[in-house]
Amino acid sequence: MAARRFHQLVGTAVGVAAVGLAAAPPVQAESVLLVSKGQSIQEAVDRAKPGDTVLVLPGTYQESVRVTVPHLTIRGSGDRTVITPPAVPGGNACAAGGYGICVTGTADQPVAGVSIESLAVSGFTKHAINASDTDRLSVRFVLAQDNGQYGISVEKSTRARLSMNRARNNGQAGIFMANLTSGEGGALDTESAMISGNDVSANRIGVVARRVRNLTVENNTMTGNCGGVFVVGDEGTPRAGALSIRLNKVVANNKFCPANSRLPVIQGSGIVLTGVENTTVELNRITDNVGTSPLSGGVVLFPSFTGGPNSGNTVKDNTALRNGPADLSDRDTGLGNTFNGNHCLVSAPAGRC
């Protein structure tokens, strides 16, 4: 049997502490399905009901896991629980797509309340975690590293919480949130989604928010990427914007990434706004991001690849030092962008510090 079901009341979740997760919150579940090394996480998920927890003990699990059950929690044992690609290609749709964990709903019925916690996902050709058509998704204490494209990818989703994760050495973004991962269209209202407390390093770009609205990115650390944070929009409507980028540490994102069909070379980019509106960048510490790309510098405003301008954005009360070619760079022709109260030395054009 792939898992053992333990019927229990919520109060008995103290048993989680016995497997080294004393700091985890109480299990809000009707049942716990325990998965040990050599067993299948997917089999446990397939047996689970809404409200259940799949508790995965230490070990390496060579599989992809597809979740369609609402209000399900998958909880590992920290970095000792590792999900890697299956030895034999194929399997479910998640495996066929090159993903580690998929949380998949539909446009008519988003899958709600799924939590993924305290595990590592590594080595997949595309994304460690791929979420589509979800509501109130929670991903926390996850290590997503050495994946071909994104560490954590969330599209067509509302009210997600991505917190206290580590995303390292992924081929594209460490954390990616978008209206669509492929395709265009107007910006999605994320309904106050949150990306917070994450450590994002050695990716192409640390955090990408593409064609979304009403998202907060705060208290994250981005270092060693080609670029720290990219907020991306275009001329489509609704326009991307109404984001808050605050209280982040964006340090020495000086890895070199070659140009592609949409973007020039990326190196030394701290926080980049391209084609967005009414976004606030405040109280961040942005230091030592240096390069010679048009996107290089501490905080950079740059037109979108389709020419869509930035407009109505506020850059205030940031510490931006030792960035190059400038700490603050306004390379846009959009209207209503303001720079106030920033601690910096060099701006382009002059007068922004």
Predicted regions located by residue number:
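Secretory targeting and sorting signals
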Residues: 1-29
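Right-handed parallel beta-helix/beta-spiral solenoid domain characteristic of secreted/periplasmic
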Residues: 30, 34-39, 71-124
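Acidic Gly/Asp/Thr-rich repetitive segments characteristic of extracellular carbohydrate-active
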Residues: 31-60
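Parallel beta-helix/beta-solenoid
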Residues: 49, 69-70, 78, 111, ...
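Extracellular beta-strand solenoid repeats
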Residues: 55, 66, 75, 84, ...
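Extracellular beta-strand/beta-solenoid scaffold signature
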Residues: 88-107, 123-130, 146-155, 169-190, ...
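Leucine-rich solenoid repeat scaffolds
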Residues: 307-353
